[in-house]
């Protein structure tokens, strides 16, 4: 179909066009029901990463899943009534202690009560020989004292807090076990709170879905304020808002079919599409008001042929910038890149299909005064060299602080600060000095060989020397055998059945594999965690298991360190690809490598300024902020494209270079500023979800979008005035 015929169709049958497009949009949008939210940090690592592969193997062989920790508080948690409540809750959640989770989904449960029961089960005179909670307060305190340092992972020194830890199977119904746990703690008088990976993940999932519902109306509100400031016209508001709303519905409907897994960063897609989609509508609407023809079809054809082309170029380059995230080794980045890429395409389609019919139906004819933009254009032209020099100085200063840019993977930064589960988990971490996350070591060897057990015990002692709490079957054996490892295998044949009956032995049926659980200190920096994981692995490497093998540590801490190790490499990789592809696209679009290179100069400046922004705002690269550079390449290039496209258009009309540059800034100035501010307004909504990682993301990306605008308006003219530009 020729462009003139397409333009005529849009304005001659506007209601029909809008009706058909609405039907298609809601048919696609119906697939949004397939979307689901994940909050596990492990999804940020590629499946072939050794830490993930080992954890997957352990989870499959041992059916290991998430953990639930019940945080117990009281004036004296060793009070018999409190201990009875702990015992009651434990039995309600884990009624079948010996089933390995096959019936109740709980592989093992550990609390101060289970340790007291173990001590009490020892033969006289060390215990009563019965696996039960003693009724004597004296006996309870004696058993706790005999536990030594082992009690510190479950009991605070002031006896005002303790914990019950449940390790769950990986095939458990999360909602069902959480409901069961909530019901259990509600039936006792002692204050108890659910924390741990499963409650945290559930809280973050639920909150993330609510946040998406919050962001949308806020983004609309903030963007509407900007639009009303510029246009003061409800018609204009309707014209610029409907297309991005349709594009959001189309995007999430598409994701519901092809990539239904959402993560925390997916929340930003809504704000990005509102901001960028509104930009496209603004460009077409403002150009429409410039045309003076009485024939609306010819005016629409003109804006589609000129500004429409610039919007198409912006769409293509923005899609390229976002699609560079799809070559990431991190699955959530791939899905985020796909969502943004498809969303921008739908934004362009929605804008082209809907804006002309809306202009026709609403008879929009508002004229904009541009005298202020004439003065702005004059300032940009007259001071371009000074502005360029200032930009270069800032760039040099930014590069000087590049070594100060850090990387960080902090799960709590992805969690809303006002969520009770998160607050209690952080409080628990501070009081017990550990994160509560599961870190494990897989050991293969003959577990009935005392030498193997001694090697494991020696390794655990080295772990404890560096502040790591470790527990394995060896600790259970020593507790039953009066603090010693048996010298003969025959004694082990009698001890293992007792441990298995108590649910305290992570060993396989052949006694050839076992797991060591670790509790690492909380509150460390990512660099300290990296050094700690490295030290743990050094201890593992130095441990010799007779005819066996010990694998490196895996679990929450090891995964966070592994993610942190690939963050910088992933950003450089996606950034290089986006710059290369955008440059290639601009060469094809402009049919000139010179114009392509010049158009990218503002983005080059902004990317060089990024380290300075990160250091100034005290923000590290994370699984959220890592995508910013690629987003800026895709979005920030738009401003340069519109100026370049308008400059070439004015040159074709016969204007001299200086006047053409001035005219380009003058005519596109309003649209560019309005587009930048609407994008900022849309993104600003994300700041109100009270998630630190997303707030950092918003601060950096807003700063870089505004600087992209400044670069296009004030720095680009200096290069277009060069003699080589014709």
Question: What does each model-found stretch correspond to?
Answer:
Residues 1-226, 230-235, 367-572:
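Feature of extramembrane
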Residues 1-43, 129-130, 145, 149, ...:
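Membrane-embedded transmembrane helical bundles of large multi-pass transporters/channels
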């Amino acid at each position: 179909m020729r462009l003139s015929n397409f333009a005529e169709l849009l304005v001659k049958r506007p209601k029909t066009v809008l009706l058909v497009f609405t039907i298609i949009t809601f048919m696609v949008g119906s697939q949004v029901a397939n979307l689901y939210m994940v909050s596990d940090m492990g999804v940020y690592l590629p499946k072939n990463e050794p830490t993930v592969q080992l954890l997957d193997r352990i989870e499959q062989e041992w059916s290991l899943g998430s953990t639930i920790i019940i945080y117990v508080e009281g004036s004296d948690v060793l009070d018999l009534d409190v201990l009875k409540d702990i015992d009651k809750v434990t039995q309600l959640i884990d009624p079948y202690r010996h089933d390995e989770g096959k019936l109740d989904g709980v592989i093992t449960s550990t609390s101060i009560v289970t340790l007291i029961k173990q001590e009490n089960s020892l033969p006289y005179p060390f215990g009563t020989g019965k696996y039960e909670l003693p009724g004597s307060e004296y006996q309870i305190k004696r058993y706790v004292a005999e536990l030594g340092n082992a009690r510190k992972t479950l009991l605070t020194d002031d006896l005002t807090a303790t914990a019950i830890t449940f390790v769950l199977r990986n095939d458990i119904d999360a909602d069902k076990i959480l409901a069961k746990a909530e019901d259990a703690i509600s039936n006792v008088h002692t204050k108890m709170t659910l924390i741990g990976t499963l409650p945290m993940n559930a809280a973050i999932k639920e909150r993330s879905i609510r946040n998406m519902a919050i962001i949308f109306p806020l983004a609309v509100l903030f963007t509407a304020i900007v639009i009303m400031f510029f246009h003061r016209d409800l018609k204009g508001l309707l014209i610029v808002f409907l297309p991005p709303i349709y594009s959001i519905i189309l995007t999430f409907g598409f994701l519901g079919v092809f990539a239904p897994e959402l993560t925390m960063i997916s929340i930003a897609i809504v704000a990005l599409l509102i901001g960028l989609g509104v930009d496209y509508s603004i460009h077409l609407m403002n150009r429409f008001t410039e045309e003076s023809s009485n024939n609306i079809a010819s005016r629409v054809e003109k804006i589609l042929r000129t500004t429409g082309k610039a919007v198409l170029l912006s769409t293509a380059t923005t899609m390229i910038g976002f699609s560079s995230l799809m070559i990431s080794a991190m699955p959530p980045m791939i899905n985020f890149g796909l969502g943004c890429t498809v969303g921008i395409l739908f934004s362009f389609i929605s804008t082209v299909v809907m804006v002309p019919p809306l202009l026709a139906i609403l008879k929009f004819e508002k004229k904009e005064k541009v005298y202020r933009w004439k003065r702005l254009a004059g300032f940009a032209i007259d001071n371009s060299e000074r502005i360029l020099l200032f930009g270069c100085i800032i760039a040099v200063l930014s590069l000087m602080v590049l070594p100060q840019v850090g990387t960080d993977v902090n799960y709590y930064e992805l969690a809303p600060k006002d969520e009770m589960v998160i607050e209690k988990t952080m409080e628990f971490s501070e009081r017990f000095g550990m994160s509560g996350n599961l870190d494990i070591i897989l050991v293969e060897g003959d577990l009935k060989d005392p030498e193997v057990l001694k090697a494991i015990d020696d390794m655990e002692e080295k772990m404890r020397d560096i502040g790591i709490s470790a527990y394995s079957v060896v600790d259970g054996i020593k507790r039953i055998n009066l603090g010693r490892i048996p010298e003969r295998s025959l004694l082990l044949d009698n001890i293992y059945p007792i441990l298995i009956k108590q649910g305290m032995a992570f060993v396989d049926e052949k006694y050839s594999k076992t797991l060591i659980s670790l509790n690492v200190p909380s509150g460390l920096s990512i660099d300290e965690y990296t050094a700690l994981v490295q030290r743990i692995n050094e201890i593992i490497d130095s441990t010799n298991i007779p005819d066996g093998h010990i694998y490196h540590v895996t679990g929450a801490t090891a995964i966070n360190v592994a993610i942190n190790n690939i963050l910088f490499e992933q950003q450089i990789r996606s950034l290089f690809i986006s710059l290369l592809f955008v440059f290639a696209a601009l060469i094809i679009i402009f049919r000139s490598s010179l114009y392509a290179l010049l158009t990218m100069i503002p983005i080059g400046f902004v990317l060089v300024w990024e380290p300075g922004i990160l250091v100034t705002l005290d923000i590290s690269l994370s699984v959220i902020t890592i995508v910013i550079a690629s987003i800026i390449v895709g979005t920030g290039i738009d401003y340069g494209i519109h100026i370049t496209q308008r400059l070439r258009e004015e040159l074709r009309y016969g204007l001299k270079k200086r006047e053409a540059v001035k005219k380009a800034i003058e005519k596109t100035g309003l649209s560019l500023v309005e587009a930048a501010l609407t994008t900022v307004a849309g993104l600003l909504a994300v700041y109100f979800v009270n998630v630190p990682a997303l707030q950092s993301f918003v601060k950096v990306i807003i700063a870089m979008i505004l600087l992209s605008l400044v670069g296009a308006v004030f720095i680009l003219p200096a290069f277009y005035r060069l003699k080589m530009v014709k």
